[in-house]
UniProtKB/Swiss-Prot annotation:
Pfam families: DEAD, Helicase_C, zf-CCHC. SUPFAM superfamilies: P-loop containing nucleoside triphosphate hydrolases, Retrovirus zinc finger-like domains. One of its GO terms (biological process) is RNA metabolic process. Residues 803-950 form the Helicase C-terminal domain. Residues 583-767 form the Helicase ATP-binding domain. ATP binds at residues 596-603. This is ATP-dependent RNA helicase glh-2.
């Protein structure tokens, strides 16, 4: 309501009539106005009328009822009170306000900016009407009921309350809201954006219009039934000048989602790249002094004003102290006042002790909060700090039958209905069948009888799942018995939500600047780098040898000057064997299936020639094409590998016109889509997200020239992504294999995968093998610890230098300075080991499929920068990751096949740097014979116990010489 209500007592300047100009029966009339004011009082009543700036104010009263009328800026205010009732009318800026109160009721009417507000109260009821910006608000209260009506921006709001009921109506932006409450019930109606919201109930009703921007608690943050952002509605406003104002209805404005540390958008404070700012010390809420919380405050407890958003204010409806029906009084009889709360809207807070809107349980006036000690009832400390002897507490009883000795879920008695649960009893949310959402009968948040508890396993009654006679339910993920879903060895299935989709991804990554990107993955060549050049190279086409002119240096490759500078800046000095052959072969247009050891530079082997050709031919995706038409699609098996290849591509494309974009699950879909819609010449991503964007038309494959599968054996394997790969290559818009160049790279290529891969390659493709296919990196020293499951934990602690008895570590232990990756098979084990290591003061972190993408990215970041030197990982980290300075890989659990073993140990020993791999293994491991072959291929020592367990004559079985390197020979290799 307008502050102009205070003008009722203004002195007359032009025309004034006083001393009962038209008074009857000993009444008095007052009138004031800049242009004209009228007031009349009859039968001992009092009438007030006020008008300013050409407005008209009319006040009249009969039978001892007060009436107030106020008009400002061309508005008209009418107020009428009869039979002890009170009427308030206010009109501002050409609006019209009508207020009428009869038979002890109260009526409020307010009109602003050309709107019309009607308020009527009869027989002790209260009616509120508010109209703003051409809207119409009608409020009517009869027989002790309360009606609220609000209309804004051309909308219409109707509120009606009868027989002790409450009705709320709100209409915004041309919409209409209706609310009615009868027989002690409550009706809420809200509407926004031209929709219609209807709420009515004999017991309870709740209605909301479009977008849920109005109605109960309407708007973005607004008050009870308020408008957008808390404005212009019942309950809107702040601590003053608000209709029903108070904390909860306060307009908080648009929510700020910026970083708390640097105030920039796009990330949270724990991801902020800026230095952490010191926060101001927190102070006591009661005395505003630092050093303690309000519950421990030695000062006298101060009353909290406007708590829960539904108490006083200082002016406007809802102001004052005391109870009753006075307007804005501040002394006693304040309408909707804070204290006592009798007969006022929101009295005693929102919902007073009696006769107030929402009175009773849910909105009950709790009075001053008791912060005394629970044990001795004295202030100044909590019960756990109490110096008095602990008092015995009464035994807990069953919630259902009130008898001790058992919980309600085990109660043998018939289940009783729980009345008024969730804090809404009697009044606002009240009782069994009255109030907002109360009890058993209809309403918002109603509590229907729950019925008997059912077994979680079989859904039967009479027992709990722990006592169920039926077989236990299988794994939630795969349906098999014997394990839970968090320990499931099978690939995780997406969990569908209400719309048939998984949970929405919200992660938006913060990209590193280019200098950080260049330094992040810069791994210097190690002392064993030349071992790569000792490997035998086989290059064939249709099983026939092929001659190739190799590129011994990057300067010999067909790279532009800008890319050559970027390659040098990235720390590349000499081409590896895989790069020497693929750089010219890809430039010549061949399809390739390439196999080389881990850590030998395969990513650069396909990225450099593809990017150089596209830049040289100026074949780039530009904004003029009207969408994302990538020239190259790179598919990877994991999000982490996608991100790594993306950053590698950023280095090579630096200061060129080429754009490379990552696409993978876990990123916010809207953000990811917005990035690629800007255009991307190269898309690198995981299969699922790329398939999704292709199907919806965001990624258009018509101009795709290069199709790359990294870790191709995993991508094509029948247990991997083979079906989805087939779907992508068979899209109608995807060029046929004869019209595109297909490239496949991996460190392992089983025969079965090679056969399946041929379906995607042109006739005459090149098969390139550096060393033996499936050979381990010779720069990695492979060690084995024979132990059973119960010995693994202690063995791990011993290797990491942790005292098994005291769980302590020497400060100068290598575990703090060297990076270690521990591979496990189950997510639960990863979390368990991380907890154990952390308790021993060893900084450890986990990465597995159950972690959110934000957590996975943060884990890799902390491992890369050394703040967490131990990474415990599942299979998501076993392929492709190129992390600088990994000294040791530990296979806590052995993988299922030899190829995964080779990939795991390949996380160390990169680019000729010496690495170490330790595997915990038992004598019945099914990989023993293959491990013997891998060790022999790498010229490493085979433990005697492994020779015997694998059958002894391993050399003849795999075509190797029967002699095994001696310990001395092995030392010479290192």
């Amino acid at each position: 309501m307008s502050d102009d209500w205070d003008n009722n007592t203004a002195a007359a300047k032009t025309i004034s009539f006083g001393s009962n100009p038209s008074g009857f029966g000993g009444g008095s009339g007052f009138g004031s106005g800049n242009t004209g004011g009228f007031g009349s009082g009859n039968a001992g009543g009092t009438g007030f009328g006020s008008s300013n700036n050409g407005g008209s104010g009319f006040g009249g009263n009969n039978n001892v009822g007060p009436r107030f009328g106020n008009g400002n800026a061309g508005g008209t205010g009418f107020g009428s009170g009869n039979a002890g009732g009170t009427g308030f009318g206010s009109g501002n800026a050409g609006g019209t306000g009508f207020g009428s109160g009869n038979a002890g009721g109260t009526g409020f009417g307010s009109g602003n900016a050309g709107g019309t507000g009607f308020g009527g109260g009869n027989a002790g009821g209260t009616g509120f009407g508010s109209g703003n910006a051409g809207g119409t608000g009608l409020g009517s209260g009869n027989a002790g009921g309360t009606g609220f009506g609000s209309g804004n921006a051309g909308g219409t709001g109707f509120g009606s309350g009868n027989a002790g009921g409450t009705g709320f109506g709100s209409g915004k932006a041309g919409g209409t809201g209706f609310g009615s409450g009868k027989a002690g019930g409550t009706g809420f109606g809200g509407n926004s954006n031209s929709g219609s919201g209807f709420g009515s109930g004999l017991t309870n009703g709740f209605g909301s219009g479009n977008n849920h921007e109005s109605g109960f608690g309407g708007g973005k943050s607004g008050g009870f039934g308020g408008g957008n952002s808390g404005g212009s509605g019942f309950g809107s406003g702040g601590n003053s000048n608000g209709f029903g104002s108070g904390g909860g209805g306060q307009d908080r404005g648009e929510r700020n989602n910026n970083c708390f540390n640097c105030q920039q958008p796009g990330h949270r404070s724990n991801d902020c790249p800026e230095p952490k700012k010191e926060r101001e010390p927190r102070v006591c809420y009661n005395c505003q002094q630092p050093g303690h919380n309000s519950r421990d405050c030695p000062e006298e407890r101060k009353p909290r004003e406007g708590r829960n958003g539904f108490t006083g204010g200082s002016s406007g409806f809802g102001g004052g102290n005391g109870g009753g029906t006075g307007f804005d009084s501040g002394l006693t009889n304040g309408f909707g006042s804070g204290n006592n709360g009798e007969s006022g809207f929101g009295s005693g807070g929102f919902g007073g002790n009696s006769n107030g809107f929402g009175s009773g349980g849910g909105g009950q006036d709790r009075g001053e909060r008791n912060n005394n000690c629970f044990n001795c009832q004295q202030p100044g400390h909590r019960s756990n700090d109490c110096p008095e002897p602990k008092k015995e507490r009464e035994p807990r009883v069953c919630y259902n039958c009130q008898q001790p000795g058992h919980n309600s879920r085990d109660c043998p008695e018939e289940r009783k209905p729980r009345e008024g649960r969730n804090g809404f009893t009697s009044g606002f949310g009240g009782g069994n069948d009255g109030g907002f959402g109360g009890g058993n009968a209809e309403g918002f948040g109603n509590n229907e009888e729950r019925g008997p508890m059912k077994c979680f396993n079989c859904k039967g009654e009479g027992h709990r799942s722990a006592e169920c006679p039926e077989p236990p339910r299988g794994c939630f993920n795969c349906g098999e018995q014997g394990h839970r879903s968090n320990e499931c060895p099978n690939p995780a299935k997406p969990r569908e939500g209400a719309e048939g989709e998984g949970p929405k991804a919200t992660y938006v990554p913060v990209e590193d600047n280019m200098e950080e990107v260049f330094n992040m993955q810069k791994i210097s060549e190690g002392l064993m780098f030349n071992k790569f050049f000792d490997a035998e190279v086989k290059i064939t086409s249709d099983k026939k040898p092929v001659g190739v002119k190799t590129c011994k240096t990057f300067s010999e490759a067909n790279l532009g000057e800008t890319m050559k500078k970027n390659v040098a800046h990235a720390g590349y000095t000499k081409t590896t064997p895989i790069q020497q052959y693929t750089l010219p072969l890809i430039h010549q247009g061949h399809d390739i299936m390439a196999c080389a050891q881990t850590g030998s530079g395969k990513t650069a082997a396909f990225l450099l020639p593809i990017m150089a050709r596209l830049i040289d031919e100026n074949d780039l995706n530009t904004a003029g094409e009207g969408g994302c038409y990538p020239r190259c699609i790179i598919l990877t098996p994991t999000r982490e590998l996608t991100d790594q290849i993306y950053n590698e591509g950023r280095k090579f494309a630096y200061q060129t016109m080429m754009e490379i974009r990552p696409v993978y699950g876990g990123l916010a879909v809207g953000y990811n889509k917005g990035q690629i819609e800007k255009g991307a010449t190269i898309i690198v991503g995981t299969v699922g997200r790329i398939k999704h964007f292709c199907e919806e038309g965001t990624i258009k494959l018509d101009k795709c020239r290069f199709f790359v599968l990294d870790e191709a054996d995993r991508m094509i394997d029948a247990m991997g992504f083979g079906t989805d790969i087939d779907t992508i290559v068979n899209y109608e818009s995807m060029p046929k294999k004869e019209n595109r160049q297909t490239l496949m790279f991996s460190a392992t290529f089983p025969d079965s995968v090679q056969e399946a891969a041929r379906n995607h390659l042109k006739e005459g493709y090149i098969m390139l093998a550096i060393d033996k296919i499936g050979a381990a990196n010779k720069c990695v020293l492979q060690e084995f610890e024979k132990c059973d499951r119960s010995e693994k934990k202690d063995k791990l602690l011993e290797i990491l230098g942790i005292d098994i008895d005291s769980y302590t570590t020497e400060k100068n232990s290598e575990v703090y300075t060297k990076k270690t990756i521990v591979f496990v098979s189950q997510r639960a084990m990863a979390d368990t080991l991380a907890s154990i290591l952390s308790s021993a003061q060893v900084p450890a972190i986990t990465i597995h499929g159950a972690r959110e993408q934000r957590e996975r990215s943060e884990a890799l970041r902390q491992f890369r920068n050394g703040s967490k030197p131990v990474l415990i990982a599942t299979a998501v980290a076993e392929r492709g990751l190129d992390i600088k300075g990994v000294d040791h890989v530990i296979n806590y659990d052995m993988p299922d096949n030899i190829d995964d073993y080779i990939h795991r140990i390949g996380r160390t020993g990169r680019v000729g740097n010496a690495g170490r791999a330790t595997s915990f293994i038992s004598e019945d491991c099914n990989l023993l014979s293959e491990l013997v072959r891998v060790l022999s291929d790498a010229d490493q020592l085979v433990p005697e116990w492994m020779q015997g367990a694998s059958g002894g004559n391993f050399g003849a079985s795999f075509g190797f010489e029967s002699s095994v390197p001696t310990q001395k020979q092995d030392e010479d290799c290192w």
